[in-house]
C-alpha cells in the first residue's frame, strides 16, 4: 500500500479496480479541517482523465505495470500492428484503444506496451517525437508580438500551434505528453 502523501507524477495506482497514472497532485492543508490530496489521474484502460480527492494519509494499492519495447509496423483498416523487438511476436490494437497515440505514431517507431496482470492496457510513446510539417500558413512579416503562434499540420495529421518562423517541410520536436511544440529538430 502507498500513502497518498507519497504521490509523485508518473506513479501508477489501482483504485476501485481501475488502473490510473498520476498526472498532477497537490497537497492541501486548509486552515480548518483535515489535510487532503487533490490529484489529476489518467485511466490507463480508457485514456480518460479524472480528478480525485483523497484524505491525507489514505492508502491506495500500487499497480505494477510491466512494459516491453515494441515497434509499430503497419495499419490495416482500423487495426494497428506492433512487433516485439526481442521475440518478434506481433500484437494488434484497434483504433479505439490507441486513438490518442495515433496523433504521433509513425511507422517503425519504438513504443512501450504496458501490461497489468497479463492484460495489455495500452501503449506509451516516447516523451518527444520528431515530425515533419506538411502544411502551415505563412508567417506575417512584422508581427513580432510575443508568443504569436500559427497552426501547422504534421505528417500524422495532427495540428499543433507553432511559432511564426516555422515553415512547411521542417522537422519539429513535439512533446507527446503535452501535445505541444518543443523546438526545431
Curated annotation (Swiss-Prot):
Keyword field: Cytoplasm, Elongation factor, Protein biosynthesis
Pfam families assigned to the protein according to its UniProt record, in alphabetical order: EFP, EFP_N, Elong-fact-P_C
InterPro entries from the UniProt entry: Elong-fact-P_C, NA-bd_OB-fold, Rib_uL2_dom2, Transl_elong_fac_P/YeiP, Transl_elong_KOW-like, Transl_elong_P/YeiP_cen, Transl_elong_P/YeiP_CS, Transl_elongation_fac_P
Keyword Cytoplasm among record annotations: yes
Statement: the UniProt record of this protein carries the keyword Coiled coil: no
Single annotated GO MF: translation elongation factor activity
Functional pathway: Protein biosynthesis; polypeptide chain elongation
Gene Ontology BP annotations: peptide biosynthetic process
Recorded GO CC terms: cytoplasm
CDD domains reported in the protein's UniProt record: S1_EF-P_repeat_1 (cd04470), S1_EF-P_repeat_2 (cd05794)
Superkingdom of origin: Bacteria
Subcellular location(s) of the protein: Cytoplasm
Family note: Belongs to the elongation factor P family.
Function: Involved in peptide bond synthesis. Stimulates efficient translation and peptide-bond synthesis on native or reconstituted 70S ribosomes in vitro. Probably functions indirectly by altering the affinity of the ribosome for aminoacyl-tRNA, thus increasing their reactivity as acceptors for peptidyl transferase.
Listed PANTHER family: ELONGATION FACTOR P, ELONGATION FACTOR P (EF-P) FAMILY PROTEIN
Identification of the protein by name: Elongation factor P
Gene name of the encoded protein: efp
Amino acid at each position: 500500500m502507498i500513502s497518498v502523501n507519497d504521490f509523485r507524477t508518473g506513479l501508477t495506482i489501482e483504485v476501485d479496480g481501475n488502473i490510473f497514472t498520476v498526472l498532477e497532485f497537490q497537497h492541501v492543508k486548509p486552515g480548518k479541517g483535515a489535510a487532503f490530496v487533490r490529484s489529476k489521474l489518467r485511466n490507463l484502460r480508457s485514456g480518460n482523465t479524472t480528478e480525485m480527492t483523497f484524505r491525507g494519509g489514505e492508502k491506495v494499492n500500487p499497480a505494477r505495470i510491466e512494459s516491453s519495447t515494441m515497434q509499430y509496423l503497419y495499419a490495416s483498416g482500423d487495426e494497428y500492428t506492433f512487433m516485439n523487438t526481442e521475440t518478434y511476436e506481433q500484437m494488434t490494437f484497434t483504433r479505439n484503444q490507441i486513438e490518442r497515440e495515433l496523433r504521433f505514431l509513425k511507422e517503425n517507431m519504438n513504443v512501450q506496451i504496458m501490461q497489468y496482470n497479463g492484460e495489455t492496457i495500452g501503449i506509451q510513446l516516447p516523451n518527444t517525437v520528431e515530425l515533419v510539417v506538411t502544411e502551415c500558413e505563412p508567417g506575417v512579416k512584422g508581427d513580432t508580438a510575443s508568443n504569436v503562434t500559427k497552426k501547422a499540420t504534421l505528417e500524422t495529421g495532427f495540428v499543433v500551434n507553432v511559432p511564426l518562423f516555422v515553415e512547411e517541410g521542417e522537422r519539429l520536436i513535439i512533446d507527446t505528453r503535452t501535445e505541444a511544440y518543443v523546438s526545431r529538430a
